[in-house]
Regions:
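Conserved beta3-strand ATP-binding lysine motif
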Residues: 2-7
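AlphaC helix of the protein kinase catalytic domain
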Residues: 58-68
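AlphaC helix of the eukaryotic protein kinase fold
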Residues: 8-27
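Activation-segment/catalytic-loop signature of the eukaryotic protein kinase fold
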Residues: 39
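Activation segment signature within eukaryotic-like protein kinase domains
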Residues: 76-77
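Conserved short submotifs of the Hanks-type protein kinase catalytic core
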Residues: 43-57
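Protein kinase catalytic-loop region centered on the HRD/HxD motif
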Residues: 82-92
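C-terminal lobe helix-coil module of Hanks-type protein kinase domains
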Residues: 139-239
């Protein structure tokens, strides 16, 4: 059972959003999103029922166990993407994807909380001009919320990538400065720290996928969540640094010169043993 906070009952906007949560949640159907349970009783106070999900949040896992294995992270990311697609199919954005809102149960991830969900059409009619600050958590919300730019599915992608980065590193990609950034100038000077700096076991191509999904400019992120997931699973040549590529690709001339030198040396050694003795 979820009930509204007593401290916020005097806030009409909060009460309105709370009432909307049940309706929003009832529209979403996915094994990776917490389910709204229909109440058969006549209600005498404000509440709604949700599925009981046993398990630990991703934040619990990180705080108690540190970084998580890449294979598990990819599996959980797959689950979260399936959950987010359920929102996106209903023209909704979750807007508050963060480690505390993802529960792990039997090795699978489930998205919880509907308090910040944006529903196309509905929000435009009910949202006041004063309600410009994002309802989600600043540390994980995409820059466009604070810059008052259009929010899209790529906004959820950014938040998801923040969570994936934290699962793999127990850190955040832009440091403490990200949460404090509120304008274009502040966002423009942010420095992305590669995931493998914090965790050397992270492949460079996985970091490349994270870096793309975490672009401050939403236009530079992935077109779809499936592309992001694919690049987490399989190496994308675009993200392989020159140093990681074979010598024949980096410098064909040097490769063939080196190979020729090896062959010549091999021939000389053979001749020495045949005629030098």
């Amino acid at each position: 059972m979820k009930t509204p906070s007593v401290l916020c009952l005097g806030d009409p906007g909060y009460v309105e959003r709370f009432v909307m949560e049940e309706w929003v949640g009832s529209r979403i159907s996915s094994p990776h999103v917490v389910e709204i349970v229909k109440s058969e009783r006549k209600r005498t106070f404000l509440y709604y029922l949700i599925e009981m999900v046993e398990g630990k949040t991703i934040m619990d896992r990180i705080e108690k166990g540190g970084v998580m294995e890449l294979a598990e992270v990819v599996t959980l990311t797959d689950n979260m993407i399936k959950g987010l697609r359920a929102f996106h199919r209903r023209e909704s954005l979750h807007q508050d994807i963060k480690p505390d809102n993802i529960v792990i149960h039997n090795g699978k991830a489930k998205i919880v909380d509907f308090g910040s969900v944006f529903v196309a059409g509905v929000d435009e009619m009910t949202r006041s001009s004063e309600d410009e600050i994002p309802l989600g958590t600043l540390e994980y919300s995409a820059p466009e919320y604070r810059l008052n730019r259009p929010r899209t599915e790529r906004s959820d992608q950014f938040s998801l990538a923040m969570v994936v980065y934290e699962m793999l590193t127990a850190k955040v990609p832009y440091g403490e400065a990200y949460e404090k950034s509120m304008n274009i100038k502040q966002f423009s000077v942010l420095t992305y720290t590669p995931a493998y700096v914090h965790n050397p076991l992270i492949p460079i191509w996985v970091d490349g996928a994270l870096r793309k999904a975490l672009q401050v400019n939403a236009d530079l992120r992935y077109d779809s969540l499936s592309e992001f997931l694919n690049d987490l699973k399989y190496p994308n040549e675009t993200f392989l640094s020159p140093e990681m590529k074979p010598l024949i690709e980096r410098n064909p001339l040097l490769f063939w010169k080196g190979l020729s030198a090896v062959l010549v040396a091999s021939q000389l050694v053979t001749l020495f043993f045949l005629f030098g003795a």
